[in-house]
Amino acid sequence: RAEDAGGTGGVLPLTRAASAVSARMFALAGRLRGGRPLHPRGLVFDATLHLHGASRPWGVPFLDDTAELRGMARLSRAAGLPPPLPDVLGLALRWEQPADEAGVAELLLASTGQGLLGRHLLRPRMRWVPAFYGSLLPYAVDGRRLFLGAVARPTRTVPADDAALARAADERPI
């Protein structure tokens, strides 16, 4: 899902300052934790990305075209809190680009809200599915900004713990 954020896509001084503070905090957390500061554990699955195309052209095949891409998905809990405590959930996607765009692409998403304000806020959840996973910050595309997201369709409920996720994936695609 792509959503226009408006604006020119320029980097604001506040954004640069927030990025610098975040980088220092994550480096410190990683040293204190002795490993990854966020998403320390997760499960990796084969994945199929179903791209539906945007409602208006962006000039980028990934956004404009209807396609089915094969790749990998990693689902993880951000803080690594034990279930059943809610945690911010992460969805990391990796896929091979089509032949004319050689290389590997990655998209990192987290459980967020969907509204005008909510898309900027992390949302701790207790279930992998149903859920919305979005980009916290917009991507710059041809002078415009947009938010990307993925919807875990509500065909069933899957609690946010690794064992339940593994069982659900063994039964059928998530």
Label every PLM stretch briefly:
Residues 1-174:
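Active-site-adjacent core segments of small-molecule enzymes
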